[in-house]
Amino acid sequence: MIVASDTADLSSRIINTIEAVSAWMASNRLRLNQDKTQFLWFGSALQLAKRDSQVLSAVCPALLALTSARDLGVILDSDLSFDKHVSKLSQSCYFQLRRLRTIRTSLSPAALHTLVHAFVCSRLDFYNSSLYGVKASTVDRLQSIFNAAARLLLNVSKFAHISAAIWDTLHWLPVKQRIGFRTSLLVRNCLVGSAPDYLRELCVPVATNEYRRKTRASDRGVLIVPRVRTERFGRRGFSVAGPYLWNTLPVDVRRLATSCSLLAFKRALKTYLFSQQTRHF
């Protein structure tokens, strides 16, 4: 990803990046085909309206501009709304649910539960921490998929209301809490050292700030939340969302991150999220 402040800076960064990639590929006996090289703009609606596409056309005429691109199974769009990703995900999950519904009578409840988790829930949980801060309508679309999966497991009508008691029976968290659950687990991995370095450096405890002074916040396991100016591209970033969600957890849950096993922390975190959730089904 290339971040530039102005047009001239963008041109030089693109040229340097292409030259670096080409040199690396040449050293590994590969060749960069610029005719198949594509790029994707990221920014707010105002920033995208001000973009100068002629700059890239002048620097690399063969570059093809995209409105969305797939990366590690996730469809990224220019404004990071993930609308296309959720649409594709909904299509895939509902297709799997329809297939499972046709063979439901031939499966045991345990087998059906396993298949729903394998073909539906795993798809919804994959990369869902990147969905933090998306529009409420996007979260509702994902929640509808969970509702349909719950109706299939409990063998109720597709028009039946999914009450809080049913969710307690399945012990499933709502989509919004599932996103917070995965993000908090990622922060925990950063604190114990099992996450990559580029993520660990984003989760800085208060005790290790520039003043190096021990405070009450450091005893409670509080992390530093950077200041940001933008809502979509600032607060949604892991450097802000991760520490912010972590600081909202109770002190006893945060302390389990480094003092207990991953399983014990996940149980405590899930219990807390269940106690705090507001059910609107």
Segments the model singles out, each with a brief description of its role:
Residues 16, 23, 30-68:
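Short, conserved micro-motifs composed of acidic
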Residues 60, 197-243:
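Amphipathic alpha-helical
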Residues 66, 106-118, 170-180, 228-233:
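Structural motif
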Residues 22-40, 138, 143-207:
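Short, charged alpha-helical motifs in flexible N/C-terminal segments and linkers
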Residues 1-23, 133:
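Catalytic palm subdomain of template-directed nucleic-acid polymerases
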Residues 1, 25, 69-79, 93, ...:
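Short, conserved catalytic/metal-binding micro-motifs enriched in Asp/Glu and His
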Residues 11-14, 18, 32, 86, ...:
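Hydrophobic packing residues in well-ordered alpha-helices of helical domains and bundles
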Residues 62-130:
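Basic, alpha-helical interaction scaffolds
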